[in-house]
Amino acid sequence: MVQYPMTANGAAKLRSELKQLKTVTRPRIVKAIAEAREHGDLKENAEYHAAREQQGFCEGRIQDIEAKLSNARIIDITNITNNGKVIFGATVTIVNVETDAEVTYKIVGDDEANIKINLISVSSPLARGLIGKTLDDEISIVTPGGTIDYEIISVQYIA
């Protein structure tokens, strides 16, 4: 069985969502289905069909989260020997060599990635280029727009 890396924070968020789905969302949907059934003919009952569709999405998400958590390898970055290298969970500040544009990313699991808040997937091309590198190393990342050269100016290990 393949295990997928995940930060402790990412696992906690998934557990919280799972609890919400099981204790709040699922019972609300079951109640909505019961109420819709009371309205009679189910063939043309839009409320019933909408509630059943919600139930399908909810149950699918529950199964998805449970599978992710059961296959997750929770990595606590504070317990890893890093020797100053970029590793999973590291917060890395890089600067574009050409433009001097500076950006900070945290390398996280696939399910935690959110580029809007600078969380990049460990399997992304940028993260793959950063893993194993150290402070002041330069990397070249091939993008659809061409190759971009970056220099690592900071590596932090923040939980």
UniProtKB/Swiss-Prot annotation:
UniProt keyword list: DNA-binding, Transcription, Transcription regulation
Keyword Ribosomal protein: no
Protein name listed in UniProt: Transcription elongation factor GreA
Transcription regulation among keywords: yes
Similarity remark: Belongs to the GreA/GreB family.
Primary gene name: greA
Lineage per the UniProt record: Bacteria, Pseudomonadati, Pseudomonadota, Gammaproteobacteria, Alteromonadales
Record field: transmembrane: none
Taxonomic superkingdom: Bacteria
Job description of the protein: Necessary for efficient RNA polymerase transcription elongation past template-encoded arresting sites. The arresting sites in DNA have the property of trapping a certain fraction of elongating RNA polymerases that pass through, resulting in locked ternary complexes. Cleavage of the nascent transcript by cleavage factors such as GreA or GreB allows the resumption of elongation from the new 3'terminus. GreA releases sequences of 2 to 3 nucleotides.
Taxonomic source organism: Psychromonas ingrahamii (strain DSM 17664 / CCUG 51855 / 37)
A Gene Ontology molecular function term of the record: DNA binding
InterPro entries attached to this UniProt entry: GreA/GreB_C_sf (IPR036953), TF_GreA/GreB_CS (IPR018151), Tscrpt_elong_fac_GreA (IPR006359), Tscrpt_elong_fac_GreA/B (IPR028624), Tscrpt_elong_fac_GreA/B_C (IPR001437), Tscrpt_elong_fac_GreA/B_fam (IPR023459), Tscrpt_elong_fac_GreA/B_N (IPR022691), Tscrpt_elong_fac_GreA/B_N_sf (IPR036805)
Cystine pairings recorded for this chain: none
Entry's Gene Ontology BP terms: DNA-templated transcription elongation; regulation of DNA-templated transcription elongation
